[in-house]
Amino acid sequence: INSEQHENNAMVIEQKSEGENQNIQNTNTVKENETSAVKDNIVDYSEYFQGISGCAVVYDEISNTYFLYNKENCETEVSPLSTFKIVSALAGLENNVLVNENSTMEYNGVKYPIDTWNSNLTLKEAFENSCIWYFRQVVDIVGQEDIHTMLKELQYGNSDISEWNGSKINSLPELNGFWLESSLKISPVQQVATLNYVFSRENNFNAENIEILKNIMYVTEYDNGCLYGKTGSGTDGKAWFVGFIEVNSNKTYFAVYLEDVQNKDIVSGNKAKEIAINILSNWENKND
């Protein structure tokens, strides 16, 4: 079972419906400190979505240009789902809860429906297998104050961790959290801006920690470079794939978000990843 299936399986463990109508807000396209001379291009990526409802953001750091498909959805805040593991891993590293890719959290003995979760896991293993209980332990050890401080520095969506223990979409407390269809929300554009801030802009993060984070986000070789990212899967046809491609030290950031209850049987983190890769391949060909 791959990590995207792990997320889907985990999110349906005695899931409770949250309803479709969420209080959402449109957000600025970029962080306040990134607004200078940013350009937006509205694009049509519908051919890659094949009838699935969703949106996509691609950000070219060289030209400082955002390419937006379904702009309104790109600026609408939703749950980050398991893409938040990028931030929780960084928070763990920055606060010395985690020290390297082999930092281990102890398994509690509960029999989970996902076999790869049923043992002690390293950071690398937990990230690859999208293990909720591992990152639940990490954020609890880091604590609410330091998590919130990091979210404010990143300008990460609404930075709302008020439902710290989550919305009880899963029956086990260690499989819930504020980032799983709960209080924390972020838009696809904000996802891209966050990644750009972490990996391409001046910040106060430890360079070794950023390198560890980058290593665990590695997905595959991509053309003449590498693809890095994280999937996220939720209930009722919600899914993410966010990350960047790096070629000769130049990065192109992206976020694909799907939300389609009518096609929920085919919507997954894997599907979002497939769409993102197709968009990026076409985008690169047009920009060679």
Where are these regions (language model features)?
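Structured C-terminal helix/loop/strand segments within mature extracytoplasmic catalytic/sensor domains
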Residues: 3-46, 77, 140-143, 196-288
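Second-shell loop/turn segments in exported
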Residues: 72-79, 110-125, 133-140, 175-183, ...
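Extracytoplasmic
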Residues: 51-53, 73-75, 79, 83-84, ...
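Mid-domain, small-residue-enriched loop/turn segments at the edges of structured enzyme/sensor domains
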Residues: 122-123, 137-195
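Active-site SXXK
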Residues: 77-102, 126, 191, 254
